[in-house]
Every structure is written in C-alpha cells, then in structure tokens.
C-alpha cells in the first residue's frame, strides 16, 4: 500500500490516496485506489481500534487460546463493523469509478467474503463438538483434542491475514501510528533491582 500524504486534521498525516489490495482466500482479490473523505477516515479509525484490540489480528499459536474465543471475537467484529457502517451512513460508501474502493466496499466485502463463511461453517461444527464434552473433562483439553481443530485454526489464520491487510489500510487512512505491530524495546534491569 502506497499513499500520497498530507497533513490532516488533528495534527496527523492523512492520505489523499492509497492503493489497497486484500487477498480473500477462495474468492480472489479486492484491490483499488482509495481516496478517503473525512467520514471514511473517522470510520477507519474506529474499525482499526476494534481490530487492533481483538484477538482477530493476533496469531493464534497451536497451544494458545481457545477456538471458541477466536470465533466469538470475529462475531463481535461483524457486529461492530455493521454499527460503524450505520453510524457513518452513505458517506463511507459513495459511488466510485471502477478501480476505486471505499470504506464501505472494503468492510462489507471482508465481512461477507471472509468472516461470514468462516463463522457459518465452523460455529455449528464447534458447537456440536462442544456439547459432547463430559462434565469431568476440561473445556480447553476437550477443544484441543478435537480432530478438526487444526483445520479450524488454519482457516482462522487465513481470515486473520485478510483482517491484518484491512487493518493496515485502515491505519494508513486514519493517519495514525501502528498499534498492532508495535516493537517493545527489551527492558534492562538496574543493578540490584529485581
């Protein structure tokens, strides 16, 4: 994603235009030029914060987290995105020329082509497996013993990559610092302190 930058409102760098490319597994690519208006910048910030603070853009290691939590987080992203679209209305989804994209176009397509298929397939399958758990079996151990867990983890990772690419575009449009891949410097201990 490259963009021409200008100083925007509130002292941040806001792009006049960026190139966007999102690879949607099993569907293809959504790409184009985004020339955001102020409402799109504000909506981009809101959705960026949502994505940056959810497990949906953080890699889910093989022995980390619960699949149910990951699906629930993605479900919440769905609702929040719809809420943002309603709040900003048509201003974030204007008609544009072929080859151009808008906040609305990107958001709705990521929901419908990436998140929705994952949730509609895996939510009922995981629920059916969860109800088989005996009371004496730990929910974490039960979920990790599911033979389809690696397959679901792989699909969650595919969606995560789409959401990460979307978050990067939102970050540029909002004109803010990267809140997802922040490098934290190593902490040094002072002599004599624990």
Give residue spans per PLM region.
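Short, charged/polar, low-complexity loop and linker segments
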Residues: 54-58, 83-105, 134-151
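Extended amphipathic alpha-helical regions
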Residues: 101-139
């Amino acid at each position: 994603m490259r963009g021409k930058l200008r100083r925007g409102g509130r002292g941040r760098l806001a792009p006049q235009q960026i190139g966007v490319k999102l690879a949607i597994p099993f569907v293809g690519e959504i790409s184009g030029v985004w020339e955001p208006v102020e409402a799109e910048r504000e909506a981009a910030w809101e959705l960026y914060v949502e994505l940056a603070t959810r497990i949906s853009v953080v890699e889910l290691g093989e022995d980390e987290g619960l699949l149910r939590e990951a699906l629930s987080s993605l479900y919440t992203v769905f609702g929040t995105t719809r809420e943002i679209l309603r709040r900003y209305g048509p201003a974030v989804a204007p008609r544009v020329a072929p080859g151009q994209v808008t906040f609305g176009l990107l958001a709705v397509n990521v929901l419908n082509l990436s998140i929705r298929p994952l949730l509609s397939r895996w939510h009922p399958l995981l629920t059916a497996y969860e109800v088989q758990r005996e009371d004496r079996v730990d929910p974490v151990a039960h979920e990790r013993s599911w033979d389809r867990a690696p397959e679901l983890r792989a699909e969650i990772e595919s969606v995560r990559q789409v959401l990460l690419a979307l978050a990067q575009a939102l970050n540029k449009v909002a004109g803010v610092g990267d809140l997802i891949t922040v490098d934290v410097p190593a902490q040094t201990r002072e002599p004599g302190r624990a």
